[in-house]
Each structure stands twice: as C-alpha cells, then as structure tokens.
Amino acid sequence: MQKLFRAIPAIDKLIKSPQGVDLIERFGHQAFVQEARALIENAREQIIKQQCLPAFMNEQSAIFSLIEQNLQKKRMVSSKTVFNLTGTVLHTNLGRGLWSENAITAATNAMRNNVALEFDIDEGKRSHRDIYISQLIQQLTGAEAACVVNNNAAAVLLMLATFAQGKEVIVSRGELVEIGGAFRIPDIMAQAGCKLVEVGTTNRTHLWDYRNAINENTAFLMKVHTSNYHVQGFTKSVSEEELVELAKEFDLPVISDLGSGSLTDMAVLGLPAEPMVQQKVAAGVDLVSFSCDKLLGGPQAGIIVGKKVLIDALQSHPLKRVLRCDKVILSALEATLRHYLFPEKLTDEVPTFQLLTQSIETLQNKAERLKAVLNKRLDSRYILQVEPSLAQIGSGSLPTETLASVAVTVFAEKQSDLLELEKRFKALPSPIIGRFAQQKFWLDVRSAAQFEQLLNMLEEA
C-alpha cells in the first residue's frame, strides 16, 4: 500500500510542472491548489478502500485534465441561461419574464455611469431616490404619490410596519394567501409586529364582518388579491368600494395588496382580465401595492401607490432604507414603465406580452420547426408529435385561466428513455426545461423566448 501512496504526485511537483503553471495562470494559484489537493485526497481514499491506484493517477496528463475540468465547472456562472418550454410564461423558478431592450439599455447605462440617484439637478441638492420614478408612476396610475421597494412582499411588510405595529389589521379569512416558499400573509404580519384579525369564512365574507371587528386598536382594513388561487361556488366578498365607504365612517385607511398587479387592460390584448392598479386607486383605496416582475414585465421590485401623506410616512420609515432598490433596478423599472405610456406598443416591445399574445398560427409554425430539428437529433426510440397544449401565465397570476398553445410532445415506450432525454436536454449549453404529462415529455413553445437561438443550439448540438 505504501508503494501506491508513493505513486501519488506531490502538490509542489504539480504546481511547478508546465501544465500546472499554465492552469495557475488561467485559474489562479489558490483555486488550482484546492482542486489538486481534492484530487489527491480522492486518490488516497481509493487506495485505502480498494487497495488500488485510481486510473487517472497513472498518467500526469489525466491528472491535469481532471483538475482543469473541475476548475472550468466552478468558473461557470451558477445562474445558467435556460430555455423555458414548460408552458408557464412567467416561471418563478426560471426567473420570470425577460426585460425589454429599453430596460436592458437603461440598466446597462446605469451600471457604466454615475446617475442622479438621490440628487436634484435643478436645485443642486440631495433628493430621495424615488422622486423621478414616482412622477411617472403617478401619471400612469392616477395616484397622489408612489414608493418603490425591492419586491411586493417587502411593500406589504413596509406598510404593516409603518401603520400597524402593535395594532390590529382586519383581513377576510378567504384572503390569507400563501405564496411560493410557504410565505404567508399572517407570517408577514407577525414579523411587522401587528395582530391579524380574521373575519368571515373561507368562502363568504360580508361587510358587517368587517364592521363588527373594528375597534379603537384597528390600524386599517386590508384587501389581498388572491392571485394564485380562486374560490368558486357559494361565495361572497366585499369590494374595495364598499370597504372604502365603511373605512371612512371610522377614519381608517384601506390597503390593498394586488400581488401581480397590472397597468393595462389585459382583455384588450385578448388575455384573461386581471384587476388594474388604476381601478383600485380610482375606487379610493388609500394604498395599493403590486409586483413589477410579473404582469408588469419589468425587474424584481414592488410599488406602493396612494395618498401622499401615507406615502411620505413610508418614505421616512427606517425599514424603507433596508428595502430600497439600487440605481440599476430603478433605471430598468423606469424604462419598463415608460412602455405603458404607449399601450398600443406593449406587444411589440415588452417580451412578456410578446409571448402571451402569440397567435396559434405562430405557435404552430414554431412547433413544426422545433419538431423538424429534434427529429434529426433523436433516434427511433422517440416518437415526436405536434399537439395542442394549455399554457399559463405563471407567478401566481390568473391561476384558473389557461392560454391555448402548441407543444412538441415526445413519447417513448420506456419511461427510462424519456428520463434520459430530459437529462440530455439539461446537459446542453443552455438547458431545455420542459414538463412531463400524460406519459410524454412536453415542449410548449408559447413560453420559449429566444426561439431562434434555441433552434441554433439544437442544430449545433
């Protein structure tokens, strides 16, 4: 066994060899030494367990080849680009929607240059970082003022912490939502230091339920848009308009968490309707919060719009600094919002709407092209077809609504062959992510952004 151990090269010898010098120049001394030590430790363990030298230790070139492979893997960016063919357009686990070219340009410009982030150029003095984008948001929503934080959950937390710490918040039991990752409205309330008061039942809540719960310790009445589920059947809910009238009697504010949020009429685009921010503002809701990286089609952020006196209080709360956005996100968000000044161009300029509004004819053509490329790459174990599919918006938006779509389906007699194919797709330079259903592997083209790049990659694979 000692003879086997002596066959393992010393770290110093590997460092001084020509191959070692080359790898150190490319990857750095520390990284090279770490990988070399790991490889040597692996060899020692195999000698102890199996009384034999690993095959790669027989040739020095094989040792350096393995070190280089491991260094290359670790150098790769962990957030790899992927092709989304799941049929879920705004797939949370795949980064949701793509930014528009204008948003990318604005973000890149902010990265490369100083910007007037908290500086009033006209007055020549310090300002707050939301001031410029607030003016645009006010124009789009009709609100008195606006505040931007890093996501909608942060927006809800900030509103609760500012106005309800140590007080009670009244919410319908049917609106106590849980979003991805077991993140619940009651948990946010507990974190903000306020008490949740549930009213009504899961399926029915009346105006008098709210009225009966109001007392001297009530901070505000809250509406939560159930964007990721829908209760049907024997149901009753209270509208924002009704809640606003009730709140006025007790001089209380009404706060609405819209979740996905929309600044355009989805029905006009031929898509399922979703509550619009402007509608809630017009209904008299005091504060409305919504996401920016879902239906809005922008970067991850959360916007709060509403009464100026309330927004001013949010801006001055210490938590606002913790939750604020940087210059890159604010620049990208402003560029995204400017698209909404010209709603007739949304389907041409915002990738989210480009994907959602594709015609069946366009999708059929894409699916046929994808099938043709795959047919040239897959063997006889796989049967490919172009089939109708049902896509969805995703990210908790309109959970009960589907979009007609088209997919390439792959069938194999053996399930193991389909699993092997999925593994092959995931091993591509930019992995292809599909879904399993009905004993087939589905590649839904509605959610496939950068479609030409996808075909080119498959042609070259």
UniProtKB/Swiss-Prot annotation:
One of its GO terms (biological process) is selenocysteine incorporation. It is found in: Cytoplasm. The keyword Transferase applies. Pathway: Aminoacyl-tRNA biosynthesis; selenocysteinyl-tRNA(Sec) biosynthesis; selenocysteinyl-tRNA(Sec) from L-seryl-tRNA(Sec) (bacterial route): step 1/1. The modification N6-(pyridoxal phosphate)lysine is found at K294. GO terms for cellular component: cytoplasm. Keywords: Cytoplasm, Protein biosynthesis, Pyridoxal phosphate, Selenium, Transferase. It holds the Pfam family Se-cys_synth_N. Its main location: cytoplasm. Gene3D superfamilies: 3.90.1150.180, Type I PLP-dependent aspartate aminotransferase-like (Major domain). GO terms for molecular function: L-seryl-tRNA(Sec) selenium transferase activity. Coiled coil: none annotated. It comes from the Bacteria. Disulfide bonds: none annotated. Its cofactor is pyridoxal 5'-phosphate. Its EC number is 2.9.1.1. It catalyses: L-seryl-tRNA(Sec) + selenophosphate + H(+) = L-selenocysteinyl-tRNA(Sec) + phosphate. Converts seryl-tRNA(Sec) to selenocysteinyl-tRNA(Sec) required for selenoprotein biosynthesis. Belongs to the SelA family. NCBIfam families: selA. This is L-seryl-tRNA(Sec) selenium transferase.
